[in-house]
Amino acid sequence: MLVPEISLTPQMVDRFLARFGDVISVLHSKLSIGERYDQWNKIKEGQSKIVIGARSAIFAPLSNLGIVIIDEEHDSSYKSDMTPRYNAKDLAKYMAKNNNIPVVLGSATPDITTFYKARRRANRTTYII
């Protein structure tokens, strides 16, 4: 589950904890190195089934990826201008295609490209508009 800003992480974590319990890890740049290390290991060892975080969470070492959800997909924060440059939304679509899983792009105000593709049903991505 990707969120565009770190500040949105706590409310999303609360929602997921209430529904799924303690199988959640959080990854973002505001965590200390030790916290990130602990979360990374928890994911890698299979103790976490759900990862919530900002764009860098797309690199979480999940071994059995089942779905990718991108909240507020229209937000430009999913693009990294730092090296290495990447767009987490594009990576999510690539990962979903290669793993044959759905990617859900959610937004009340979708990106115009997303809106167009949803109307045209141009690919297997699920669009929530």
Predicted region positions:
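Conserved Walker A/P-loop ATP-binding site and its immediately adjacent core
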Residues: M1-F16, E35
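Structural motif
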Residues: L2, V51-I52, I69
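Post-DEXD/H (motif II) to motif III coupling segment of the RecA-like Helicase ATP-binding lobe
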Residues: E5, I67, E73-I129
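Amphipathic alpha-helical transducer elements in NTP-driven molecular machines
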Residues: P10, I24, I33-Y37, L62, ...
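Alpha-helical scaffold elements adjacent to nucleotide-binding pockets in ATP/GTP-utilizing enzyme cores
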Residues: Q11-R15, R19, Q39-K42, V68, ...
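Conserved motor-coupling elements within RecA-like helicase/translocase cores
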Residues: R15-V51, F59-L65
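Short, polar loop motifs at secondary-structure junctions
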Residues: A54-A57, P110-D111
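Walker B catalytic acidic pair
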Residues: A54-R55, D71-E73
